[in-house]
């Protein structure tokens, strides 16, 4: 029993980040998701994620935090139980071009909402966009905020600097992050564009590559690929052109998907 009221039902997912279970509130019968993470100095992403969910409150398109705590040698986070991720949909090739555009707009809207709250996600990938349950089955939610970070402190944008290691999933990080430049809002957007490309085409050319430099080169050159839609090329050209501390023109990016 977790927090004296949550009964574990079944494991949903497991990875280097920890484990996620479906659970039931034995008092209200509400179904929830519980994330577990080994408690150590090296693993503090779950506490960071809980803090950010609490900060975001009832922000549209983000799960609600129920509680955060510790039991034994693990931290746990209780949150809304949501549905399948984009990975499941992409795997079964169930997305028409029109559906991709509808979902693409939601993806940009979610990251805009996060940015409007002075936060970067820094780990954008298909598995971090999930559909809602019940009345929200067509609505995307943005999850896994363990790597999220503030980019603005009291109206002052963080400074551009070099980083020691790549932050995020290698298949989806931006060209700037490949160059070991601190991520900013532009880089979240570039990662979102790669997610949209994955919805359109499935595995991208660089997904089977292991050489970091080759992956970066393939990403850079994708705008020269005749198969890539014009709106994607325009989005990439735009987001790769703006400065580190620039506010992306979200309306322009969305407009490219509704022309």
How would you label these PLM feature ranges?
Residues 103-104:
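Activation segment signature within eukaryotic-like protein kinase domains
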Residues 115-132:
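Catalytic-loop of the protein kinase fold
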Residues 64-75:
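Short beta-strand micro-motifs within the conserved protein kinase catalytic domain, predominantly
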Residues 82-91:
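Structural motif in protein kinase domains
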Residues 19, 25-47:
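ATP-binding glycine-rich loop module of kinase domains
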